[in-house]
UniProtKB/Swiss-Prot annotation:
Protein name per its UniProtKB record: Large ribosomal subunit protein bL34
Keywords: Ribonucleoprotein, Ribosomal protein
Gene3D superfamilies for the chain: 1.10.287.3980
One GO BP: translation
Domain of life: Bacteria
GO MF terms held by the record: structural constituent of ribosome
Disordered, as annotated region: 1-45
Stated family: Belongs to the bacterial ribosomal protein bL34 family.
UniProt biased composition (Basic residues): 32-45
A GO cellular component annotation in the UniProt record: ribonucleoprotein complex
Entry-linked Pfam families: Ribosomal_L34 (PF00468)
Bias (Polar residues) ranges: 1-11
InterPro entries: Ribosomal_bL34, Ribosomal_bL34_CS
Amino acid sequence: MSKRTFQPSNLSRKRTHGFRARMATKNGRQVLSRRRAKGRYRLTV
């Protein structure tokens, strides 16, 4: 049996997928602009 790999933590979640993490890099800003263009209700977690 393999262990459950999802060990939830809000801090690591925000740090890797949060809005400021997206804004920090050029590619992250591209992600946000794509999600805005698509009309996503939530841009980030």
